[in-house]
C-alpha cells in the first residue's frame, strides 16, 4: 500500500510512544482501541502507523528555552496515501496541519513512495537543459541581481542589465520586491531586456538569460506567465511561499508555460529557522520545491549576509540534486552577501552544479557591474583550476580590486 512517511522532532513531557500513537491516530482515523472489531477491519487501511520512535538525550538548551525538562525524540509516522489526494495542500494539511499548532513539533522530512512521486512533475528543464540553453557545461553558473530598481525607469534597467551581461554573467534576475509598476511594467521589462541581451549576444557571442519577476493576483498568474512566454521571456522568477507550493506546480504543469521557473525563498523564513517548530529547510526549500517543479531554487548560503546553518544549506542542495530521484535536478542557488572572495567556499561546498548568485558583490565593485562580473568569472576560473584567489588576482585586475574591497577566503585541500 502506498504511503507517505513523515519524520518529526518532538519535545514533550509525556511518553513519546504515546505521543506518537496519538498523532498517528489523530491525523487519520481518530481513535482505535474503542472501535468495534468490524470497524477496525474496515478502517485498518486508513490508519496511521508509528514506524519508529528514537528517544534522544535531553537537550539542556531546549529545556532552558521551554522552561521545563522535556523528553525529545525523532518520530516517524506512516500515513496511507489513500487518505488524501495527490496534491501538496492535502499532504501538508494531513501531516502537519493542526499538528503544527499542537506543541513542540518540527517536521523534518517526508518520504514518498515511487507511486506517489509519479503524481508530481519535477522541473521541466533542470540543470542539464538550462546548461544547454547557455552552452555552459564545465563550471558553476554566475547570476546577478538587479538592485535599486524601485523608482527607476526602463532606461536605467536596460543599462544595468547591459553592464551585468557585459561582465560575463549567465543569468540576471529581477529583485523579488520589484512588482508591477508604471516605470518598469512586466511586459516592457521583458521586451527591453530581450533587446539588450540580444545586442550583447551579437557583440560578445555570450548568451545571458533574464529572470523576470512573475507577480500579481494568484488567479491571474497563468495568463501573465503565458504572455511572458509569447514575448520571449527566458525565465520566470517566482515568490513561491507568498503564493503556495501548489501554485508553482500549477505553473509548471501548464504546457503553454514553457520556460524555466526560479523559486525565491522570500517568506520561507517564517517557517524554517526554529530548531523546535516549523519545517526543516532541506524539506521545504529542497525536496518539496523540486517535487513541484522549480528549475532553480534560491536559499541563504552558509557564509553570506543572511547565513543559513551549513548543514541545512548543504541539505537543501543535496535534495535538489539527488540523482536517485525520478525528477530532473534543480539548480541550487546559495545566495545573500556573496562576493568574489567567497567563491572558493561556494565551489568546495556546492560544486560545479550550482549557481554563484550576487547582488552587491556585482554592483559594488569599483569598476561597476561589468567589473564585478569579470571578478566573479576570474574567481570561478581560479577555483576550477585549483589556484588561490590571490594568485589569480595578480593576473586579473578586476579580481584584485574585489579582493582589496571584500577580502578573500582561501580553501586548502
Curated annotation (Swiss-Prot):
| Superkingdom of this protein's organism | Bacteria
Which amino acid positions bind substrate, per UniProt?
Answer: 147, 173-176, 264, 337, 359-360
Its keywords, alphabetically, are: Amino-acid biosynthesis, Isomerase, Magnesium, Metal-binding, Methionine biosynthesis
Q: Which SUPFAM superfamilies match?
A: RuBisCo, C-terminal domain, RuBisCO, large subunit, small (N-terminal) domain
Top-level EC class, please?
isomerase
Give all N6-carboxylysine modified positions. Answer: 173
What residues bind Mg(2+), as annotated? 173, 175-176
Q: Which residues form the active site?
A: 98 (proton acceptor)
Annotated Gene3D superfamilies:
Ribulose bisphosphate carboxylase, large subunit, C-terminal domain, RuBisCO large subunit, N-terminal domain
Question: Which protein family is named in the record?
Answer: Belongs to the RuBisCO large chain family. Type IV subfamily.
Subunit composition and interactions: Homodimer.
Know the name of this protein?
A: 2,3-diketo-5-methylthiopentyl-1-phosphate enolase
Organism listed in the record: Geobacillus sp. (strain WCH70)
Give the source lineage, highest ranks first. Bacteria, Bacillati, Bacillota, Bacilli, Bacillales
What's the gene? Answer: mtnW
